[in-house]
């Protein structure tokens, strides 16, 4: 048995980066209700989860799967703004706390993500610039009260 907790896998059609990039591109304020996020490219998440099958056990093998370092929402917006040629607009102030996963056990047992967040930012912005289809479903990553 394995218990896997996945935090914000990224896809070009859906995810935290799509939410932020669309806001930046469209001139809408980026909500700083959550100051940082744990994110991972979906391909890496699938790879690491499959590797975890070698570790299933009783009691359950427990694993957090996401990026190894939290990423600032402000930094993501500024970086994607640069790629999109738009200065981001922000709403609110980033709190000092965030829902972040500790993925050190993941790194020790099944490895590190291979695709950098910077690369996914570039892919996401190019996807949106070429009118790539999105799922149109926000992640609500910035919500702190659990009401989506």
Regions of interest found by a model, annotated:
Residues 43-54, 121-125:
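Amphipathic alpha-helical segments that line or abut small-molecule/effector binding pockets
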Residues 23-27, 52-56, 127-131:
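Generic structural signal for alpha-helix termini and adjacent loop/cap motifs
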Residues 20, 106-107:
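Structural element of the ATP-grasp superfamily
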Residues 48-105, 145-147:
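Mid/C-terminal beta-alpha module of Rossmann-like enzyme folds, strongest
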Residues 11, 37-43, 67-71, 98-101, ...:
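Residue-level signal for the nucleotide or nucleotide-sugar donor/cofactor binding architecture
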Residues 1-44, 80:
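NAD(P)-dependent short-chain dehydrogenase/reductase
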Residues 31-33, 61, 89-92, 136-138:
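Short, hydrophobic secondary-structure boundary micro-motifs
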Residues 117-148:
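Amphipathic terminal alpha-helices
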């Amino acid at each position: 048995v394995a218990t896997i907790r996945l935090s914000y896998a990224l896809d070009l059609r859906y995810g935290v980066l799509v939410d932020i990039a669309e806001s930046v591109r469209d001139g809408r304020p980026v909500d700083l209700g959550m100051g940082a996020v744990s994110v991972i490219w979906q391909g890496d998440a699938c790879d690491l989860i499959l590797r975890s099958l070698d570790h299933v056990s009783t009691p359950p093998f427990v694993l957090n799967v996401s990026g190894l370092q939290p990423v600032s929402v402000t930094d993501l917006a500024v970086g994607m703004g640069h790629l999109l040629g738009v200065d981001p607009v922000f709403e609110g102030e980033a709190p000092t706390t965030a829902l972040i996963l500790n993925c050190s056990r993941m790194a020790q047992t099944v490895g590190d993500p291979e695709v950098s967040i910077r690369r996914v930012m570039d892919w996401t912005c190019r996807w949106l610039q070429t009118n790539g289809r999105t799922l149109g479903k926000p992640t609500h990553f910035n919500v702190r009260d659990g009401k989506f």
